């Protein structure tokens, strides 16, 4: 569907238009999520919060700040199924990713939930 048609469809149908998420933001979400998975033992023992899988939303509620310094994410994680089962998270991670989304700039926290 052409961009103009999508815009017209959204306007006339009363549906909200989706915000565009930059490629750098998508890379940043993926990098932050994969860093946390690898560092915390792999998917067999650790799964980040569901917001970290929402690349179309740029990280959703996990994205705390996006500016010229890059992307700052704060999210929890736990054993596989922790959110679906309603159990407590076992980790909390604060990670800053470069503005281009390609480098972990700083991990200010990766420990027990605060």
Give the role of each language-model region.
Residues 1-4:
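Bacterial N-terminal signal peptides that target proteins for export
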């Amino acid at each position: 569907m052409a961009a103009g048609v999508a815009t017209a469809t959204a306007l006339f149908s009363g549906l909200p238009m989706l915000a565009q998420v930059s490629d750098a933001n998508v890379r940043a979400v993926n990098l932050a999520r994969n860093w946390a998975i690898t560092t915390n033992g792999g998917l067999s023992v650790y799964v980040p919060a569901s917001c970290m899988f929402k690349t179309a939303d740029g990280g959703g509620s996990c994205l705390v700040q996006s500016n010229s310094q890059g992307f700052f994410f704060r999210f929890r994680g736990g054993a596989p199924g922790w959110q679906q089962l309603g159990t407590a998270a076992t980790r909390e991670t604060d990670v800053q990713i470069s503005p281009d989304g390609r480098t972990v700039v700083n991990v200010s926290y990766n420990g027990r939930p605060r």
